């Protein structure tokens, strides 16, 4: 077998009909086929078309050259020291050109009789010269079933045959190399009458044409984007060097099955088959109750628990049950206060990786969701929805026991612990328990004496971030809490609430002004009492 047996040529007119992506696909496959033939020791000279492709020149040939190079291919293969054999009887010649070829395009092909189902093997013939005793490599072979006949490159149907990773048995029998075929989504070649349609090698349904495949996959091949649009990405990847090394890699437990669409590698062929469904969009496992389909049986099993209400994974600490084991693992971090996902920029830790990913958007400036009323921006749409309730006053989450309403579901969940008395967060040093993890974190600072929140202006440290924010307003002069009746502004919300009592008292009893001391006065009063000094007189409001 020579390179001419697998080469494809175009005339100048035919070459002009191809777009950029189709030409890139042609260059890549031709060079890969030449590399394969050379590695087998079957070709010594470098053909003119290969030189043109390596130089980036246009590889078209004069129209007078005979381009039906597939004629009598099977006979020529048997004449050499290597032969291409079938696992079944072969009768007749290989197809010389693809069916339905557009006018003016006569394309020679790599022989692919019954390409969807046949299994071919390369056998070493006795009596071969020593120069041809090189072992065949484990490189994937590309069989061209329908070369660039579509209007777009993603319509070209390419069959990828992955080399079997099993080591050949040590015996006197000729060494064989078997290829297993996997189909890449795209246009399927039309099948002659009385011939079964090509079946997807991934377990599932069979399709006779591209429209049926696209309808079943929901057009996923179009949504794949660059994976199908860029031939060099589709056909890229490094291959094992020799057949023996491929077998040794399998025995050593190394990954040997590679997806040609995304270069992901798997240890088992069954794992590759499952992965291929993400590209084809095939979902053969369907729920009998709602009709929803899944690509794996495990996903269907998890989904069916929604209908049955089964929650087999229970927390040993609090008894809460979950449908998925992963949900139980995330829940158990509440009890352990484990936060293994830490931000490399600010050091903030999170219990879930998804929360860390959202947090990183803050450093990157990624806050695409803006409030229409105040302009505040958020990295999540759910956070924006929660924030908008502060403007509307909406509190859709109501406690069934006491009727208290909340704007967030998490606030209701925490409130319900008041009724149940649940305190799942325990301090490891003193044993004190808390209903919230944030309260436990603040409590642990008492044991360590740590004050992680430090003011950049005066250097004063604080145990709570909220206290630092309030302290910073002393330096900035900011007073965000404004009285709606008189316009007076305050640095802290408690001070505003105390001030608003003046207006409410004036309405109920204009003759008796509110003499209730403010929070600052009471704090100073208590300090003097603790120090043994003479306390200031506490003014009490006049009785009506």
Swiss-Prot record:
UniProt-listed Gene3D superfamilies: 6.10.140.140, Classic Zinc Finger
Kindly indicate whether the keyword Metal-binding belongs to this entry: yes
Could you identify this protein by its name?
Zinc finger protein 324B
Q: Where in or outside the cell?
A: Nucleus
Q: Which residues cross the membrane?
A: none
Region Disordered, annotated ranges: 184-222, 508-544
Q: Where is this cross-link: Glycyl lysine isopeptide (Lys-Gly) (interchain with G-Cter in SUMO2)?
A: 214
State the family it belongs to: Belongs to the krueppel C2H2-type zinc-finger protein family.
**Biased segments, Basic residues type:** 524-533
Q: Give the species.
A: Homo sapiens
A Gene Ontology biological process in which this protein takes part is:
regulation of transcription by RNA polymerase II
Which Pfam families does the entry mention? Answer: KRAB, zf-C2H2
Report the stretches of sequence that form zinc fingers (C2H2-type).
257-279, 285-307, 313-335, 341-363, 369-391, 397-419, 425-447, 453-475, 481-503
Quote one Gene Ontology molecular function term: DNA-binding transcription factor activity, RNA polymerase II-specific
Stated role: May be involved in transcriptional regulation.
Q: Does the keyword Zinc-finger apply?
A: yes
The residue ranges of the KRAB domain are 1-72
Q: Which UniProt keywords apply?
A: DNA-binding, Isopeptide bond, Metal-binding, Nucleus, Repeat, Transcription, Transcription regulation, Ubl conjugation, Zinc, Zinc-finger
């Amino acid at each position: 077998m020579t390179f001419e047996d697998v080469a494809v040529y175009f005339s100048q007119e035919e070459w002009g009909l191809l777009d950029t992506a189709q030409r890139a696909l042609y260059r890549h496959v031709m060079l890969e086929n030449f590399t394969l033939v050379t590695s087998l020791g079957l070709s010594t000279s470098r053909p003119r078309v290969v030189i043109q492709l390596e130089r980036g020149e246009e590889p078209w040939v004069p129209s007078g050259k005979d381009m039906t190079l597939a004629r009598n291919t099977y006979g020529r293969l048997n004449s050499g020291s290597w032969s291409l054999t079938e696992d079944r009887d072969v009768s007749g010649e290989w197809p010389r050109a693809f069916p339905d070829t557009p006018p003016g395009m006569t394309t020679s092909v790599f022989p692919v009789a019954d390409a969807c189902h046949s299994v071919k093997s390369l056998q070493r013939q006795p009596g071969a010269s020593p120069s041809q005793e090189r072992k065949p490599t484990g490189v994937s072979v590309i069989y061209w079933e329908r070369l660039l006949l579509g209007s777009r490159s993603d319509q070209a149907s390419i069959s990828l045959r992955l080399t079997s990773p099993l080591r050949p048995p040590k015996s006197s029998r000729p060494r064989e190399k078997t290829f297993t075929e996997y189909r890449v989504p795209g246009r399927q070649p039309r099948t002659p009458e009385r011939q079964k349609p090509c079946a997807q090698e991934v377990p599932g349904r069979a399709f006779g044409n591209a429209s049926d495949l696209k309808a079943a996959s929901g057009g996923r091949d179009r949504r794949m984007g660059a994976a199908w649009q860029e031939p060099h990405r589709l056909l890229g990847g490094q291959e094992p060097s020799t057949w023996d090394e491929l077998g040794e890699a399998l025995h050593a437990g190394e990954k040997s099955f590679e997806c040609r669409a995304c270069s992901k590698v798997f240890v088992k062929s069954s794992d590759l088959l499952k992965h291929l469904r993400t590209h084809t969009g095939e979902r053969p496992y369907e729920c009998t109750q709602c009709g929803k389909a899944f690509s794996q049986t495990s996903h269907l099993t998890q989904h069916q628990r929604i209908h049955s209400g089964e929650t087999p994974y229970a927390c040993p600490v609090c008894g809460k049950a979950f449908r998925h084991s992963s949900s139980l693992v995330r829940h158990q971090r509440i009890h352990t206060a484990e936060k293994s996902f830490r931000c490399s920029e600010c050091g903030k830790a999170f219990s879930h990786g998804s929360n860390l990913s959202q947090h990183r958007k803050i450093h990157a400036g990624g806050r695409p969701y803006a409030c229409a009323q105040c302009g505040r921006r958020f990295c999540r749409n759910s956070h924006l929805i929660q924030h908008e309730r502060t403007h509307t006053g909406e509190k859709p989450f109501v406690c069934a026991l006491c009727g208290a309403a909340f704007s967030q579901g998490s606030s209701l969940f925490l409130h319900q612990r008041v009724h149940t008395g649940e305190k799942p967060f325990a301090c490891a040093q003193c044993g004190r328990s808390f209903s919230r993890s944030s309260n436990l974190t603040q409590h642990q600072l008492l044991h360590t004496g740590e004050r992680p929140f430090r003011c950049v202006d005066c250097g004063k440290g604080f145990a709570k971030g909220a206290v630092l924010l309030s302290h910073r307003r002393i330096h900035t002069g900011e007073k965000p809490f404004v009285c709606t009746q008189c316009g007076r502004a305050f640095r802290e919300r408690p001070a505003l609430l105390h001030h608003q009592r003046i207006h409410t008292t004036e309405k109920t009893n204009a003759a008796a002004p509110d003499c209730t001391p403010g929070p600052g006065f009471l704090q100073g009063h208590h300090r003097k009492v603790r120090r043994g000094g003479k306390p200031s007189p506490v003014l009490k409001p006049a009785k009506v």
